[in-house]
Amino acid sequence: MAHKKGVGSSKNGRESESKRLGVKVYGGEMAKAGNILVRQRGTVHHPGENVGIGKDHTLYALKSGVVVFTRKKNDRSYVSIKTES
């Protein structure tokens, strides 16, 4: 028999923090060079004109302009920046 009462611990408290993924600047909105446009896991959206891609697949603006989302024949979503020129 146990001589000490077992001390239980909570079975909760393991929830991982949300990673705040998703579109940060939507189509038709202005974006400055360097702005993060989309945070994602894998290439859900692909980089188009004037958009760069980071090592964690984050899409960011290379130039300032208006954000444009397009879907091409291969059914991929592309994010581009339309500059004022």
Curated annotation (Swiss-Prot):
GO annotation, cellular component aspect: cytosolic large ribosomal subunit
Keywords on record: Ribonucleoprotein, Ribosomal protein
An annotated GO BP: translation
GO terms assigned for molecular function: structural constituent of ribosome
Disordered: annotated span: 1-21
Top-level taxon of origin: Bacteria
InterPro entries xref list: Ribosomal_bL27, Ribosomal_bL27_CS
Ribonucleoprotein found in the keyword field: yes
Family: Belongs to the bacterial ribosomal protein bL27 family.
PANTHER family: LARGE RIBOSOMAL SUBUNIT PROTEIN BL27M, RIBOSOMAL PROTEIN L27
Full protein name: Large ribosomal subunit protein bL27
Organism: Porphyromonas gingivalis (strain ATCC BAA-308 / W83)
